[in-house]
Amino acid sequence: MEIVIRTGSGDVRGSKENGIAVFRGIPYAEPPVGAHRFTAPRPPRPWDGVRDATEFSATAPRPPYPEAIGALLIERFIPGDDYLTLNVWTPDPNAVGLPVMVWIHGGAFTNGSGSEPVYDGAAFARDGVVFVSFNYRLGIIGFADLPDAPSNRGLLDQIAALEWVRDNIARFGGDPGNVTVFGESAGAMSVCTLMATPRARGLFRRAILQSGAGNMAVAAEDATTIAAVIAHRLGVEPTAAALAHVPVAQLLDVQQQVAQEIQGAPDPAVWGERIAGGSVLLPFAPVIDGELLSQRPAEAIAGGAGHDVDLLFGTTTDEYRLFLAPTGLLPFITSDYVTAHLAKSGLDADAAKAYTAEGRGEEPGDILASIITDQVFRIPALRIAESRVDAPARTFGYEFAWRTPQLDGILGACHAVELPFVFRTLDRAASLVGTNPPEELAETVHNAWVRFATSGDPGWPAWNPETRSVMRFDHPVSEMVTDPYPATRALWDGVPL
């Protein structure tokens, strides 16, 4: 059954699927092609007639994941240039005032799309939510800092998508005044950035941060260095005008080289002392440009930004095992390597003993995975919560602790494992969660997200600095936990991240 809705740019034709109206590939901006590859998003050109919105659009250009991780996180690739589009699942286009949830996908700002099978919005629509997902520009195209182009184009795309929601979602039954924006990993970092920038103020009422916070921003001087190296390797000037003529495949090749070098052992002769010293973890990420961002998002939030936005935040128990376990590196990590990492991170060598004492690792590889889980994910998220103690809006915390049986159980409750539980798409993620994950846990997690988007209350007490209580999701029992892993949390007090 076909359904036609009039948007601000023209009519779109969706389809009725199991009682839910679904619209795919609706443009929220013009395709970023040719001379417009690096420009700010432009409003979609109005069209005559009815535009088909029954199939997903192209996905943003991105390289493949490393093989070991790509076997777990399956990506959908759809070729084409018209990829600044969004998708809508609605229980009833004729309804009035339904809560809206807008999903921002993760992928280190270089991978992912809004059309991945695990992000199917049908379960949210079945529970009375108008669900929206979208694509945004990634990698060099979205985040390389160039003097003749706006910075943070990927973020500008996200804002443009949210503005489309504000202007059009009532036509799909949604309430533009009750929007929850949520994301995972780089998507959660994006949400935190949107909370921090005045440009997005008023576009959403609630936010959910899944495994990402507000400390991943690139300093302007580092962004300039990265752009210069990219251009040098491509044999062009470090400008948008020059890079607009470089084939996308070449951009992606250099993008992969740059990411591997910066995340490995960057040569100071190439990258300078700052980047070689670890100033950049994600080379393509929000840039502190003085316009969209004047400081790191975490600092802006500590100063009061986004304090009127209800917040649900959390992490998985074993985040970093996704990046260590599949590669086979865990058994080869030595105690000396752990000690060196602790020293570089500003912690004493004895910190490793605290991780073992709290049951967070016996072997060096397991200890390192827990240390980096805290360093990159858990502690930055907790600092966001701590900075909102006096906020008028409420803050809620969670920990996702269910351990996947995949790879003989060595992944644990790794990064991204909660996604099919949030979306109730367990059958789309067997590579990550196996063939018999607990559906009851998916129902529990998903329902909490729906409750939060509907009312601002996921169903458990708000986070506070006295108890630091969070909901620990696990099977067969999910329960409130007071101050998880307090000793290792305290190790990071005062340590810059």
Swiss-Prot record:
Signal peptide range: none
Active site positions, chain numbering: 185, 319, 415
Record GO terms (molecular function): carboxylesterase activity
Protein name, as recorded: Carboxylesterase
InterPro entries xref list: AB_hydrolase_fold, CarbesteraseB, Carboxylesterase_B_AS, Type-B_Carboxylest/Lipase
Lineage: Bacteria, Bacillati, Actinomycetota, Actinomycetes, Streptosporangiales
GO CC field: extracellular region
EC number(s) on file: 3.1.1.1
Annotated keywords: Hydrolase, Secreted, Serine esterase
